[in-house]
Swiss-Prot record:
Keywords: ATP-binding, Carbohydrate metabolism, Kinase, Nucleotide-binding, Transferase. Belongs to the anhydro-N-acetylmuramic acid kinase family. It comes from the Bacteria. This is Anhydro-N-acetylmuramic acid kinase. Its EC number is 2.7.1.170. The keyword Lipid metabolism does not apply. Gene3D superfamilies: 3.30.420.40. Transmembrane segments: none annotated. Pathway: Amino-sugar metabolism; 1,6-anhydro-N-acetylmuramate degradation; Cell wall biogenesis; peptidoglycan recycling. GO terms for biological process: 1,6-anhydro-N-acetyl-beta-muramic acid catabolic process; amino sugar metabolic process; peptidoglycan turnover. GO terms for molecular function: ATP binding; kinase activity; phosphotransferase activity, alcohol group as acceptor. ATP binds at residues 9-16. InterPro entries: Anhydro_N_Ac-Mur_kinase (IPR005338), ATPase_NBD (IPR043129).
Length: 384
């Protein structure tokens, strides 16, 4: 079966579209990437999305217009990724997250979380003529979960190893990890874990945009940060903050790691008189150190391999810093195992859609998200 996975992550770089051929179900799941491309948002739309993510108030009418514009962009990406390739029979669209609030565990009750993704599936189905599964996070939230991360079950069946302990580390705007125990052990699936590790590229990207007055949006290959020296005192101070100490299940987003958060970090840095490259090196160090600290705090087994994916997988300096913190683990990318590091998340939502519509298989892992039970994920929309 041919399926398209669509996602725009917290970096808001554009829409990742993956056309895949898929067969099997879980242990026999097989994926072939036929075509994968990233389609940038129109600059004006991207700017509006970033403003919303940053908490800028807008009217309901404006929100509806942006929802429409995102859905149209996603539909266009789905149409274009098929050019010259077999026609897809199914779309799995994550949409664009603009707000994410994890559940609050009170003394007497649990306040359910909330996660809003724009780009409604009904319009995508109508514009493409292809059945579309979307709104994947709602069912997990209704069951008391974090609704994030949602890809660990897909990671488990695509990237686990018979004898190795692995971590699949996505570094998008936010970092998230899937811990995969050896899959030859009895009940190994129950030992799969996952959570958000903290900032991925989001603070680095915001700093780059500020330093270049918007002329650059990211640190290409980490070259700018590599010229500097990280301030370890600052990194230690930041890692004492509440999120980094919180026990999984946990999730986060631009609501926490926001321009205001970066501004506070900048104020913290003033006594150290950092150069621009030192500043970027320090923010990069926070990403690497938060990932490593998260492993050391919450994973008891020694990690044989770390499989990096997402935009951060192209940042050589960041991977070097991660290797410095975790010298006993081999740092690879998912490309090394045949799964595109650029499109792994898009592939995952294609798989989740396939599990939902074709197989009737649950997509979340309760031990990862904190949900009361495994759930069928996603709303199904058929074309008119």
């Amino acid at each position: 079966m041919y399926c398209i996975g669509l996602i725009s992550g917290t970096s808001v770089d554009g829409i990742d579209a993956a056309l895949i051929e898929i067969s099997g179900t879980e242990l026999d799941l097989k994926i072939d990437l036929i075509s994968g491309k990233t389609y940038p948002y129109p600059p004006e739309l991207r700017g509006k999305i970033i403003e919303i993510c940053g908490g800028k108030p807008i009217s309901i009418e404006e929100l509806a217009q942006i929802d429409d514009a995102i859905a149209q962009s996603f539909a266009q990406a789905a149409i274009m990724v098929q050019n010259g390739h077999p026609h897809a029979q199914l779309i799995g669209s994550h949409g664009q997250t603009v707000f994410h609030r994890p559940p609050v565990l009170g003394e007497r009750e649990i306040k359910l979380g909330y996660s809003l993704q724009l780009g409604r599936g009904s319009m995508i189905a109508h514009l493409t003529g292809i059945p579309t599964v979307s709104n994947f996070r709602a069912a997990d939230i209704a069951a008391g979960g974090q609704a994030a991360p949602l890809v660990p079950k897909v990671d488990a069946y695509l990237l686990s190893h018979p004898t190795h302990h692995r971590c699949v580390q996505n570094i998008g705007g936010i970092g998230n990890v899937t811990y995969l125990p050896p899959n030859q052990k009895p009940n190994w699936e129950q030992a799969v874990r996952g959570w958000d590790t903290g900032p991925g590229n989001v603070l680095i990207d915001l700093a780059i945009q500020k330093l270049t007055n918007g002329q650059q949006t990211y640190d290409n290959n980490g070259q700018w940060a590599a010229q500097g020296t990280p301030c370890e005192s600052l990194v230690r101070k930041w890692l004492e903050q509440e999120f980094f100490q919180q026990t999984p299940p946990k999730s986060t987003g631009r609501e926490l790691f926001s321009p205001a958060y970066l501004e506070q970090c900048w104020q913290d840095a003033q006594p150290y008189h950092l150069s621009d490259s030192d500043w970027l090196a320090t923010l990069t160090e926070l990403t690497a150190a938060s990932i490593a600290q998260s492993y050391q705090q919450f994973i008891k087994a020694p990690i044989d391999e770390i499989l990096v994916c997402g935009g951060g997988s192209r940042n050589t300096y960041l991977k070097q810093r991660l290797a410095n913190y975790l010298p006993n683990s081999q740092i690879l990318t998912t490309d090394d195992l045949g799964i595109s590091s650029d499109f792994k998340e898009a592939i995952a939502f294609g798989v989740l859609a396939y599990w939902r519509l074709v197989c009737g298989i649950t997509g979340n892992l309760p031990q990862v998200t904190g949900a009361k039970q495994a759930m069928l994920l996603g709303d199904i929309d058929h074309p008119v």
